[in-house]
Amino acid sequence: VLELCRTRLPDNMGIPADQIQVLSPTRRGLTGTVSLNRALQAALNPPAPDKHQKTWGELIFREGDRVMQTRNNYDVLWQKDDGEMGTGIFNGDVGHIAKIDPSGELLEIVFDDRTAVYTADMLAELDMAYAMTVHKAQGSEYRAVIFVSAPAAPGLMVRGVLYLSLIHI
């Protein structure tokens, strides 16, 4: 999975790593999104002296990371490049961390064409998004999808989960 995201798909098919989505039926275990996100972050966005980062719980948010909003927040202010402003970042919105101020208290996150500033106390609303569950990916589109699975709970290992992962290609 790491090699596919880091070199094989970008080099052989011209698909940038930020347009590749790894999907798993579960969050837990070796092939769950928690483990996959740790490994993918280390491979695709490792620490560097010129990258600021912020630790929150077990997560390390770093400039350049792909992140997902995990609950609706109707109060987050955002601004588009053309100056249009609005509020609301919603469960499942995926973006990337463009900037973390040196103190680590403010993070600038770009969601498609909207830029929002998050304070450190809002980090509970974010998760890494290099890998996500099939459930969270519903309704999204990606240039390339890598479906990762290993033996899991019987309820997760059904034909419908594979079907849902395939329709996101």
Across the structure, where does each feature detected by a protein language model lie?
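Core RecA-like ATPase module of SF1/SF2 helicases and allied nucleic-acid translocases
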Residues: R6-I167
